[in-house]
UniProtKB/Swiss-Prot annotation:
Keywords: Acetylcholine receptor inhibiting toxin, Disulfide bond, Ion channel impairing toxin, Neurotoxin, Postsynaptic neurotoxin, Secreted, Signal, Toxin. Belongs to the three-finger toxin family. Ancestral subfamily. Orphan group II sub-subfamily. It comes from Naja sputatrix. The keyword Amino-acid biosynthesis does not apply. Disulfide bonds join C24-C45, C27-C32, C38-C63, C67-C78, C79-C84. The keyword Disulfide bond applies. This is Weak neurotoxin 5. Binds with low affinity to muscular and very low affinity to neuronal (alpha-7/CHRNA7) nicotinic acetylcholine receptor (nAChR). GO terms for cellular component: extracellular region. One of its GO terms (molecular function) is acetylcholine receptor inhibitor activity. Expressed by the venom gland.
């Protein structure tokens, strides 16, 4: 009986882990407080800083399947843990 109970606990933990989804910040401001749950296949949080004109910066944050590319004068940081793209 104890073996059956232990087996059920292990199976439950494994099944719950398969349903894990990443949570990333998602807003265009420097100081962000909005979160989004990433879709299936999106395993990366990113923060992209675009320099549009001198002294004009644009922040982009969100989820992605792969780390986004950059243009000259852009910076991108990618990570893979919850809310890591601050």
């Amino acid at each position: 009986m104890k073996t059956l109970l232990l087996t059920l606990v292990v199976v439950t933990i494994v099944c719950l882990d398969l349903g894990y989804t990443l949570t990333c910040l998602n807003c265009p401001e420097m100081f962000c407080g909005k979160f989004q749950t990433c879709r299936n296949g999106e395993k990366i949080c990113f923060k992209k800083l675009q320099q549009r004109r001198p002294f004009s910066l644009r922040y982009i944050r969100g989820c992605a399947a792969t780390c986004p590319g950059t243009k000259p004068r852009d910076m991108v940081e990618c990570c893979s843990t919850d809310r890591c793209n601050r």
